[in-house]
Design a protein with these regions (language model features):
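Alpha-helical scaffold domains
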Residues: 1-208
Length: 208
């Protein structure tokens, strides 16, 4: 079907989901769903990430905003493609960008959706300094998936001298016991050690 559209209707989106299902790989579905225990296997269609990226990029050549108005969270793949389109959206203001970001992080329910969204959110570079306090707020949430989103966004975009001290402070304060928060904290510190060694070593010594 044609994915570069000026306008998306519910019927268009339903047709898109049918096309998405045509890319399903049952063996991959079984394997991938086993890596994401937070969702039932039935939540997965079994579409590989390169295919989803290609579809998301094609949709983004048209009216991505109209597509987002029709999207549902009925499958891992639909949710992931929503995140890809948001990441590719050329927003007109920081307010619009943060609205889409906030909306999506509320929908995160697995490490895969979280990390894929964060990695694809290239538009955040356009609003880097404005977005940083917002990312810090994510790490203060009661929702472990929003905390993880904040930590992974810091890992992806803010491991620089200008931000590293605040990043490490946020990491230290994000003490939610959820497994995937703990893993994100460890991942963040390990990556920070490679990129900002001096500051991160001070942080590690102060917490030893």
């Amino acid at each position: 079907m044609e994915l570069v559209r000026d306008n998306w209707t519910k019927n268009d989106y339903d047709d898109f989901v049918e096309e998405l299902r045509s890319y399903a790989d049952e063996k991959y579905r079984s394997f991938h769903s086993s890596l994401i225990p937070d969702n039932d296997k039935d939540f997965f269609i079994g579409v590989r990430m390169p295919v989803m990226r290609k579809l998301g990029k094609e949709i983004s050549k048209g009216n991505g905003r109209s597509f987002l108005e029709q999207t549902t969270d009925n499958s891992y793949e639909e949710k992931t493609i929503r995140g890809i389109v948001i990441g590719l959206l050329k927003t007109e203001s920081y307010e619009e960008f943060s609205m889409y970001s906030d909306d999506f992080v509320q929908r995160i329910d697995s490490w895969a959706v979280c990390d894929g969204f964060c990695a694809n959110l290239k538009e955040s570079k356009k609003y880097k300094s404005e977005f940083f306090p917002h990312v810090c707020e994510y790490t203060k949430s009661d929702n472990p998936w929003i905390i993880r989103a904040g930590l992974v966004l810091m890992l992806d975009y803010y491991l620089e001298d200008e931000y590293i001290d605040t990043v490490l402070e946020c990491c230290d304060n994000a003490k939610n016991p959820h497994y995937y928060v703990s893993m994100a904290r460890a991942w963040l510190v390990a990556t920070a050690l490679a990129k900002c060694r001096e500051q991160t070593m001070r942080y590690i010594k102060s917490n030893s």
